[in-house]
From Swiss-Prot:
Leading EC class: transferase
Topology in the lipid bilayer: Multi-pass membrane protein
TM regions (residue ranges): 14-34, 56-76, 174-194, 218-238
Gene for this chain: PFA5
PANTHER family named among the record's database cross-references: PALMITOYLTRANSFERASE ZDHHC6 (PTHR22883:SF23), ZINC FINGER DHHC DOMAIN CONTAINING PROTEIN (PTHR22883)
Descriptive protein name: Palmitoyltransferase PFA5
Keyword annotations from UniProtKB, A to Z: Acyltransferase, Lipoprotein, Membrane, Palmitate, Transferase, Transmembrane, Transmembrane helix
Extent of the signal sequence: none
GO cellular component annotations of the record: cell periphery; endoplasmic reticulum; Golgi apparatus; plasma membrane
A Pfam family of this chain: DHHC
């Protein structure tokens, strides 16, 4: 059984590259048809517009290289990212004293634990979400990927055309991929449409002599541009609201089927944790910074120049290494750039619910006495 399961996983890992290979093949075919059949044979040789032909060929080939380079980063060099392992929160004491039967000596057993943050997503009892596959806490906006076998921070979606998951690390590259690919296809189909008319007018006394490869490239370019342009537009729209594609889908289902979202919040005034629930009528973008620029920077990085330069991750800081066994660490130290911050509006909404007595439960966490960096 285990062997057959491993074989299926390996087959799926290879299967996810079938569509990207098809896309790459169509890109190579379209580039050849565009550069040779249109630019060289028609624009250069027939219409005697050598400078235009060279310019179009250089632009298309350059964008081809950029698109392929971005794809390599998205899938291989950068990837979607991996959430660091997060030990259970320090809700119960990490040290337990046991008295042996033969002696009166106490023994202390310590466990790795994380000081709980001020607010985290939880179940109705106030306990954080656990990933049984990774044996780690699953933090906000993190989801487990069965394709890659680990938890992805800020999981957006699985893109079958690219062949991998889009997450925190490669989201900016994904947006740049859609932008550069749509620009490439736009140049191709617009210039083909322009020169089809010129070529037919130039050969009005003869047969139009349009190569079938040019027509097929035009069809593929228009269809591909519609796909990539709509993908780019939806990504920009979701970024402006500080939402991922998965969150938008889940939120719509919550509003339709009445599911809920629950947070465990530490009130400094009451020195107590409250479990607060948001039902479908109270749903909003919990991460929205109330500024389109701030929301986009949260996805694309603070350096605006890097928004157009397709290179690397949108941040430079790293996660700190794990502490010693039995030590207590904060979530900020573990997650580093993967830490997600709720909006001020969401925090205020939680505090308002607490003041009105609208909460599911209360609890005291041992880690709240450890002077956490709230």
């Amino acid at each position: 059984m285990a062997l057959s399961w491993n074989i299926r996983i390996r087959r799926r890992s290879w299967f996810r590259f079938i569509l990207p290979i098809i896309v790459l093949g169509l890109l190579c075919y379209g580039t050849w048809a565009y550069c040779h059949k249109l630019c060289y044979e028609q624009v250069d040789k027939r219409l005697r517009q050598k400078s235009v032909s060279v310019g179009l060929i250089c632009a298309v080939c350059f964008l081809d290289v950029v698109v392929i380079f971005i794809w390599l980063q998205i899938v291989i060099l950068v990837g979607p990212g991996t959430q660091p392992h997060v030990a259970p929160f320090l809700i119960l004491p990490i040290a337990s004293e046991e008295k042996t039967s033969n002696t009166s000596q106490n023994t202390s057993v310590e466990y790795d634990a994380v000081v709980p943050p001020k607010c985290y997503q939880s179940d109705p009892h106030g306990y954080p979400i656990w990933c049984s596959e990774c044996q780690s806490l699953k933090m906000e906006r993190t989801h487990h990927s069965s394709e890659l076998g680990h938890c992805i921070p800020r999981f957006d979606h699985y893109c079958m055309w690219i062949g991998t998951v889009i997450g925190r690390d490669n989201y900016r590259l994904f947006v740049q991929f859609a932008a550069y690919f749509s620009t490439l296809l736009l140049i191709m189909w617009v210039s083909i449409c322009v020169y089809i008319r010129i070529i037919t007018q130039h050969n009005h006394n003869y047969s139009p002599n349009l190569n079938a490869n040019i027509i097929s490239t035009l069809v593929f370019a228009i269809l591909g541009w519609l796909l990539t342009a709509s993908l780019l537009a939806s990504s920009i729209f979701y970024m402006s609201q500080n939402k991922t594609s998965l969150e938008a889908i889940i939120d719509s289902k919550r509003k339709k089927f009445g599911t809920r979202k629950i947070f465990c919040y530490y009130s400094e005034a009451n020195k107590l944790r409250f479990v607060v629930e948001f039902d479908r009528s109270e749903f909003h973008s919990f991460w929205d910074k109330k500024s389109i620029l701030a929301n986009i920077k949260d996805f694309m990085g603070s350096n605006i120049l890097m928004w157009i330069i397709p290179l690397g991750k949108p941040y430079t800081s790293r996660c700190k290494s794990d502490g010693k066994s039995g030590s207590k660490t904060t979530l900020v130290e573990i997650l580093g750039p993967y830490e997600e911050t709720l909006s001020d509006y969401t925090i205020q909404a939680i505090e308002d619910k607490i003041s009105r007595g609208e909460y599911l439960a209360t609890l005291r966490a041992s880690g709240d006495d450890s002077d956490p960096a709230y």
